[in-house]
UniProtKB/Swiss-Prot annotation:
One of its GO terms (cellular component) is cytoplasm. HAMAP family: Ribosomal_uS19 (MF_00531). It comes from the Bacteria. The keyword Repeat does not apply. Gene3D superfamilies: 30s Ribosomal Protein S19, Chain A. InterPro entries: Ribosomal_uS19, Ribosomal_uS19_bac-type, Ribosomal_uS19_CS, Ribosomal_uS19_SF. GO terms for molecular function: rRNA binding; structural constituent of ribosome. GO terms for biological process: ribosomal small subunit assembly; translation. Keywords: Ribonucleoprotein, Ribosomal protein, RNA-binding, rRNA-binding. This is Small ribosomal subunit protein uS19. Protein S19 forms a complex with S13 that binds strongly to the 16S ribosomal RNA.
Length: 93
């Protein structure tokens, strides 16, 4: 079920505070966060945010197309190592 409209989007309060501090700076630093469930709002546009995927922080530049999505949607948390190759012994020629 989606979140109620009267509640508004979920954004971690510490993340909003960090963005407000950097809003007027010329040299914007990368903001690190562990909050993958925070929704991207128009305030985030133009900032670079490093989201934790379980192993490392991966930076992403926020654009207008990303507004309304969650931060965790843009990174996978699992590594794909490919399918196992079968032995040549059992294959037909």
């Amino acid at each position: 079920m989606p979140r109620s409209l009267k509640k508004g989007p979920y954004v971690a309060s510490h993340l909003l505070e960090k963005i407000e501090k950097q809003k007027n700076l010329k040299n914007k630093k990368v903001i690190q966060t562990w909050s993958r469930s925070s929704m991207i709002t128009p305030v985030f546009v133009g900032h670079k945010i490093a989201v934790y995927n379980g192993r490392e922080h991966i930076p992403i530049y926020i654009t207008e197309n990303m507004v309304g999505h969650k931060l965790g949607e843009f990174f996978s948390t699992r590594t794909y190592r490919g399918h196992n190759k079968k032995d040549k012994k059992g294959q037909k020629k």
